[in-house]
From Swiss-Prot:
Alphabetized GO MF terms: G protein-coupled receptor activity; olfactory receptor activity
Keywords: Cell membrane, Disulfide bond, G-protein coupled receptor, Glycoprotein, Membrane, Olfaction, Receptor, Sensory transduction, Transducer, Transmembrane, Transmembrane helix
Disulfide bonds: C95-C187
Listed name of the protein: Olfactory receptor 4C16
Origin organism lineage: Eukaryota, Metazoa, Chordata, Craniata, Vertebrata
Similarity annotation: Belongs to the G-protein coupled receptor 1 family.
Length: 310
């Protein structure tokens, strides 16, 4: 691909240029990132070590937590460091890596949420065939397809970014590199690229969201014929999933279906989508799922007993 770039680095303006508020941003992002790592790593370790968390639902929860951790790590550490600097610059290649990694793990999370919805439907509505339909082999294949699909999606995004000529200026009014703010730095017409962006990212977000909400409406409607115990079990796992879907897809759809129009809240929405949801997801899942909470208690009980013996 022929590149026509005079820009070797970009200047990120971040959330604020005020030194006082930059310190506040540093503290908030650092706490959110540490909380994200702690919460998701607890889920990852619990699923891997607990025999009670070996069914397909927790297999997908494991990869959802891994995806949350990687998505946050691809963006948040850089924003934490930038909050301490007077002038924040990012090289062109690092910017492209950030675009690629954020879209890989963001898209992977979308696919995992879809797989989790399918898993919940089969578990509640077809319990006798659950282990046959959602077998370990099927879970592995579905996850491999999700990874491949995420990488293909991200390669398309990188192709779109690299097809644009950047001649300057190189100041990006954003917290991190993404296609929407990058489009504004291109020194050529970006209408076609913008349409491709919307048809790629926007369509994936919007269609997946509609499918998930529609599937849960059907799923919850089918529960009326089940016993109170089955309904309680379904709601205990599905409510948390629905909350995560709404929190994740709302900002995602907003960012990638607004045709490069900048609103004052754009940066805040992007931060919530990449940082906030990764922090909230483990909190929501552990608060609403008794099996995960029980496994975590046992894990920490064993740790405390081991420490006491020493």
């Amino acid at each position: 691909m022929q590149l026509n770039n005079n820009v070797t680095e970009f200047i990120l303006l971040g959330l604020t240029q005020d030194p006082f508020w930059k310190k506040i941003v540093f503290v908030i992002f650092l706490r959110l990132y540490l909380g994200t790592l702690l919460g998701n790593l607890l889920i990852i370790i619990s699923v891997k070590t607990s025999q009670a968390l070996k069914n397909p639902m927790f297999f997908f929860l494991f990869y959802l937590s891994l995806s949350d951790t990687c998505l946050s790590t691809s963006i948040t550490p850089r924003m934490i460091v930038d909050a301490l600097l007077k002038k924040t610059t990012i090289s062109f290649s690092e910017c492209m890596i950030q675009v690629f990694s954020s879209h890989v793990f963001g898209c992977l999370e979308i696919f995992i949420l879809i797989l989790t919805a399918v898993d919940r439907y089969v578990d509640i509505c077809k319990p006798l065939h659950y282990m046959t339909i959602i077998s370990q082999w099927v879970c592995g294949v579905l996850m491999a397809v999700a990874w491949v699909g995420s990488c293909v999606h991200s390669l398309v995004q990188i192709f779109l970014a690299l097809s644009l000529p950047f001649c300057g200026p190189n100041v990006i009014n954003h917290c991190f590199c993404d296609l929407q703010p990058l489009l504004k730095q291109a020194c050529s017409e970006t209408y076609v690229v913008n349409l491709l962006l919307v048809s790629n990212s926007g369509a994936i977000c919007a269609v997946s969201y509609v499918m998930l909400i529609f599937s849960y409406v059907i799923f919850l409607h089918s529960l009326r014929n089940h016993s109170a115990e089955v309904i309680k079990k379904a709601l205990s796992t599905c409510v948390s999933h629905i909350i995560v879907v709404i929190l994740f897809f709302g900002p995602c759809i907003f960012m990638y279906t607004c045709l490069a129009t900048v609103f004052p809240m754009d940066k805040m929405i992007a931060v919530f989508y990449t940082v906030g949801t990764s922090f909230l997801n483990p909190v929501i899942y552990t608060l609403k799922n008794t099996e995960v909470k029980s496994a975590m208690r046992k894990l920490w009980s064993k740790k405390l007993i081991t420490d006491d013996k020493r």
